[in-house]
C-alpha cells in the first residue's frame, strides 16, 4: 500500500517541489498545509500515514506540532528545515519525530528510510 503524506511548509514553492518528489516516488500526497493550524486540521480530516513538517511555521514551531501529534498517537513525522541538523539535535528526538532532513538534502529515499 502506498503511504499517504501531508506536506507542511509555509512556502508554497517548496511544497510544490516536495509534492513532485514524493509523488514521483509513489507516495500519495493527501494535502498540503501552510501553518500548524492547517496541519492539525488536515491530519484530523485526511488521516495521513506520515507528515513532512517544516520546523519553522508562522503560527507554531514544528517541534510543538510533532509533540502534539505524537501525544495523540498520530502519523509518523519527519521534520525539515533550511537549517542543518546540528542546530536541532536533541529537540528532534524529544518531540517524537522519526528524524530530520535538511531541505537541501530532501529525497524520497531518505524520507522513506526514516519511515521504516
Predicted segments, located by residue:
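Alpha4 helix (beta4-alpha4-beta5 surface) of REC/receiver domains from two-component response regulators
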Residues: 64, 83-101, 105-113
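The feature encodes the CheY-like receiver
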Residues: 58
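Short amphipathic alpha-helix used as the core "switch/output" element in two-component signaling
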Residues: 63-74
Amino acid at each position: 500500500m502506498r503511504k499517504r503524506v501531508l506536506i507542511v511548509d509555509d512556502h508554497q514553492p517548496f511544497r510544490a517541489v516536495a509534492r513532485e518528489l514524493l509523488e514521483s516516488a509513489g507516495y500519495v500526497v493527501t494535502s498540503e498545509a501552510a501553518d500548524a493550524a492547517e496541519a492539525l486540521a488536515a491530519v484530523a480530516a485526511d488521516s495521513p500515514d506520515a507528515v513532512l513538517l517544516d520546523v519553522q511555521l508562522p503560527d507554531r514551531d514544528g517541534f510543538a506540532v510533532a509533540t502534539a501529534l505524537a501525544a495523540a498517537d498520530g502519523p509518523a513525522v519527519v521534520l525539515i528545515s533550511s537549517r542543518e541538523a546540528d542546530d536541532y539535535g536533541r529537540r528532534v528526538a524529544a518531540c517524537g519525530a522519526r528524524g530530520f532532513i535538511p531541505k537541501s538534502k530532501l529525497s524520497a529515499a531518505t524520507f522513506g528510510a526514516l519511515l521504516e
